[in-house]
Amino acid sequence: MDFGALPPEVNSGRMYCGPGSAPMVAAASAWNGLAAELSVAAVGYERVITTLQTEEWLGPASTLMVEAVAPYVAWMRATAIQAEQAASQARAAAAAYETAFAAIVPPPLIAANRARLTSLVTHNVFGQNTASIAATEAQYAEMWAQDAMAMYGYAGSSATATKVTPFAPPPNTTSPSAAATQLSAVAKAAGTSAGAAQSAIAELIAHLPNTLLGLTSPLSSALTAAATPGWLEWFINWYLPISQLFYNTVGLPYFAIGIGNSLITSWRALGWIGPEAAEAAAAAPAAVGAAVGGTGPVSAGLGNAATIGKLSLPPNWAGASPSLAPTVGSASAPLVSDIVEQPEAGAAGNLLGGMPLAGSGTGTGGAGPRYGFRVTVMSRPPFAG
């Protein structure tokens, strides 16, 4: 474009009406961000590859992986450098615009010059404004030249700044024939599986009639089933000698546990164990304590034993034994007495537990009847003669 052929109104108007340098500044920031991301990605790739190859993944497969990924890492580094260059060029283009904008004549000045020229020409009746008109025209020519020079400089600077090196596409990290090889392997595997299935079905169909014929012969089937495999015979011969040991060590404890459970159930039904037995057991110590506490102190003596015939008795037996029934007419039983009363039983003795002794014979006076009404026997009084 020939900027010298355009008036200053056009050149200045374009510079002031455009978007300015903001888009170029934003583009420079975006290129910087892309360059930083590519650099970080390249460093991460190299770190992971180094760790895998030297520590965790060794062998030919690891080497092939490194050889496949190395070109891609190099491309990322080269692309990051190109992105940084693009950012620098965008900044240079923005700077060129700012320089041209500062050198261009502002449109208001151009408009004022044109307005003054129009006024001078209008009032130049006698030629008195000829010099002023020439000066105004010269000033306008300078504005024209200034705008043309600024635009030419801006065009050259922006052309250099916007010349970006084309970016190379990323390298292919896989073999071009890998897809075809994979498809061929899948097809071969599918064909092999289908062929194996078909052969298995054909074999099954071929053996099916013989199997059905064998099932129709019960005797042959039984004989075939009775044939013991060798491994089963070996297991039986190995297990029989130690089967009794397994029964004694494993079965008998369970048998004893079953007997114990049965006995516990029976004792609980009889009341020997359970809540009632627990209450009786809890009351037993108190009863024993009361019995022990009620006994008197231990005493001993010599020559004080009571006698029954030639038999000597302990002193407390005499008190524990019941009184003998008195005879009628004896000194101990007056004739005026009422029925014979049975003495109260004394405290239990130590040896025989207070067992009553046999009473003496009462044949002389007789004894009262033990049932019905008792007859009262009275002696003859002295005053009766």
Curated annotation (Swiss-Prot):
Q: Name one Pfam family in it.
A: PPE
Going by the entry's taxonomy, the superkingdom of the source organism is recorded as Bacteria
Can you cite a GO biological process for this protein?
response to host immune response
PANTHER family named in the record: GLUTAMINE-RICH PROTEIN 2
The Swiss-Prot or TrEMBL record describes its family as follows: Belongs to the mycobacterial PPE family.
Q: What else is known?
A: Was identified as a high-confidence drug target.
Question: Under what name is this protein listed?
Answer: Uncharacterized PPE family protein PPE22
Originating gene: PPE22
